[in-house]
Amino acid sequence: MARQPTKKTGPKKQKKNVPNGVAYIQSTFNNTIVTIADLNGEVISWASAGSSGFKGAKKGTPFAAQTAAESAARRANDQGMRQVQVMVSGPGAGRETAIRALQGAGLEITLIRDITPIPHNGCRPPKRRRV
């Protein structure tokens, strides 16, 4: 009978005490990714609709964005985060829902900024859907 391989454990993640930071919400038509970082840009926690257990077209829904934001906010709360500035990017359905979920999870929102990149007539957009 073969021996079971032993699991190597790396260094444990230390609990930081970071009172305020920045929450980046990247909301596309297919997914929503919420990343919470400290003011230096070091990532404290992140979650996406896919990592929260949604698959396929359900990842693009507002409920999936809410679940992802709650998950990221809970982990940031464990690290001691209380206040966040919110940077929202992208055209997706989960933008406002994710912001409300961050607020509901106990994070105080001090600023909301839309950082969606807008082309000055750059690449040609995809053709319109005909359903």
Curated annotation (Swiss-Prot):
Record GO cellular component, one term: ribonucleoprotein complex
Transmembrane segments: none
Annotated GO MF terms: rRNA binding; structural constituent of ribosome
Family of this protein: Belongs to the universal ribosomal protein uS11 family.
This protein's record includes keyword Lipid biosynthesis: no
Pfam name, any one: Ribosomal_S11
Subunit-level organization: Part of the 30S ribosomal subunit. Interacts with proteins S7 and S18. Binds to IF-3.
Record-level GO BP terms: translation
Keywords assigned: Ribonucleoprotein, Ribosomal protein, RNA-binding, rRNA-binding
Taxonomic superkingdom: Bacteria
This protein's encoding gene: rpsK
Protein name: Small ribosomal subunit protein uS11
PROSITE patterns: RIBOSOMAL_S11
Entry function: Located on the platform of the 30S subunit, it bridges several disparate RNA helices of the 16S rRNA. Forms part of the Shine-Dalgarno cleft in the 70S ribosome.
InterPro entries attached to this UniProt entry: Ribosomal_uS11 (IPR001971), Ribosomal_uS11_bac-type (IPR019981), Ribosomal_uS11_CS (IPR018102), Ribosomal_uS11_sf (IPR036967)
Disulfide bonds: none
